[in-house]
Amino acid sequence: MESSRRPLGLTKPSALEIMEIEAEGISQSRLQLLNPIPGVWFPITLGFRALPNSRREKSFSLYKDRECLLPMESQLQSKRDIGIDTTDVLLKHLMASRSSYCPDGIFTISEQGPMLAQSMATISKELSGSQANRPTLRPLPILLKGTQVAMRLFLLGLRPVRFCLRVFMLKAQEGLHLLADLVRGHNPVGQIIALEAAPTSASLPLL
């Protein structure tokens, strides 16, 4: 005698349920989610991700304990598969909405700092076709602070600091020697250096 109870787990929808799904205009492929068994669907709500019941992990209960929203798809990801280049449009949209775009597709609305606003304004001018000079980076204050810290540590007599400074100086000298060898190996530059090194008539001693 067959049991009239509906078995737990993944079950194939009946013909009546399939007809109701088709009448609502929802395709069956959108209800099929990472299916290892052909012809079996997860009973999920459209736009939601169903998590398996923690109490019935072995039986995969049809009842959902929790539901979570699917992550929103960014404009660039949604239009990537149809072959449309939307990079320019997306940048202008991001600058207009004053939002910061993360590589994982999440938009976080936040106030821009002065440096970010200036760089975004420069990018917008370049996209519009007007000439704009990019702000040049100035690493001199950073180098000055680093040099001051290194000199203070050197004056304290720390042996690792002295060793690191010595290694940096040797590497810098090695780079200068390699650069000079490369300059000599290049014919046009070598000719220019030879012409500059040759004594001119003004530098010759008068007899």
From Swiss-Prot:
This is Protein I. Its main location: virion. Keywords: Virion. It is found in: Virion. InterPro entries: Corona_nucI, N2-like_embe-CoV. The gene is N. The keyword ATP-binding does not apply. It holds the Pfam family Corona_I. Belongs to the coronavirus I protein family. GO terms for cellular component: virion component. Structural protein that is not essential for the viral replication either in tissue culture or in its natural host. Signal peptide: none annotated. The keyword Amino-acid biosynthesis does not apply. The gene encoding this protein is included within the N gene (alternative ORF). CDD domains: embe-CoV_Protein-I_like.
